[in-house]
Amino acid sequence: MKRCIKRGGRYIVCGDENQAINQFAGASSTAFLDLYNGPKTTQFELPISYRCDKSIIKLAQRFVPGIMTREEVGEGLIRRETLIKDIKPNDMVLCRLNSPLYMCYSRLMDLNIPCYIKGKEGELDELKKLINTYKEDENLGLDWKENGLFPNLYKALIEERNSYIENGYDNIEAINSQSVQYLYDNIQSLIAIGRKCQTVSELKHRLENIFIEIENGVCLSTIHKAKGLEADTVHIICPSLMPMKNTVTPIEEQQEQNLIYVAYTRAKHTLNFVSEGDFNPVKSLNNDIVDTFDYIEDRVCKLFKISYKKPKNTIIQPKKKRGKKINPIIRSTTTNVKTAVDRKNKKSTKNKIMDFLNQ
């Protein structure tokens, strides 16, 4: 960018480090901050939000204390434990992951509420790629009673995880790897769309229309894709997925906090937190990731009559500190100790959200 400026010229950069959320795609989380250190740099603060009402800004201040609202805005409304049926045309629905959005899409279609999923070019092709190798009349196998599309996709998922373990990763690191998580999320998305389908052909047909924008329709989007967008009313589904528990580094933790801030500040007047009662399978993914994969592996092994080498559980006795009782930790032998400790200690952002939701 600097090379585009003539010698002695000046340039203005406007940005918000609290909205740095794309490090996973190669974007530097510190690039904007690095500009502060340049020679003859003048910094101007722009703390006022001209989008959100007061109550929404007050909630966002839990993560970005410096944000302010203009005096003439309304009070705004924040509601907890709302329902999918409360979603109306022109509203926006946000989630940390894709698969709950597909579940919500199916429910809205059942309620005859016009909606679409905001997707990028090629995203539909990625979903189709998973099913294109199967025959049009192939059974989906959602009940696990016979071989079909989804048992085979889950088999591929377990084998993808195992490939990481064979290359030295521990169990949790393998499950949380980008390719395994991406495949799992896509499988869950297909299940949500195909729950009323019988064959691969029917599933393909239903996939064709989900990304076509509908005038006055409900926009369902991941938080990443919603950056820069706004709506009078925003519904957040599966808020327990924010922050994701598979964050390890401080930068990843900060990016998760930034995602929460971005999600809240898409709403102009009303911010709703949808009840998680309809999303229990997704909620359990974040809380019991290892148990979820153990269950999938067990079903795959029984259906295909195969077996994989499972990690054993080991009891680790921590060093006892004077005057303190320390309980033993039971973990997989393939679980990295540092990862387990880091994950256990990262509760601050999560607690901020859950304290609010439990008020």
Residue positions per predicted region:
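Short conserved AdoMet
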Residues: I5-K6, K88, K268
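Conserved helicase C-terminal RecA-like lobe
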Residues: K135-V274, D278
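Helicase C-terminal subdomain and adjacent C-terminal extension
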Residues: I251, L259-V262, K268-N358
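Short, surface-exposed amphipathic charged segments that create phosphate/polyanion-binding patches used
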Residues: K58-F63, I87, K128-E136, D288, ...
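Conserved helicase motor core of SF1/SF2 NTP-dependent helicases
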Residues: M1-E81, M92-R107, K118-E126, E215-V218, ...
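Residue-level detector of anion-binding/catalytic polar loops
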Residues: R10, P114, T270
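Conserved RecA-like ASCE P-loop NTPase motor core of nucleic-acid helicases/translocases
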Residues: C14, E71-G194
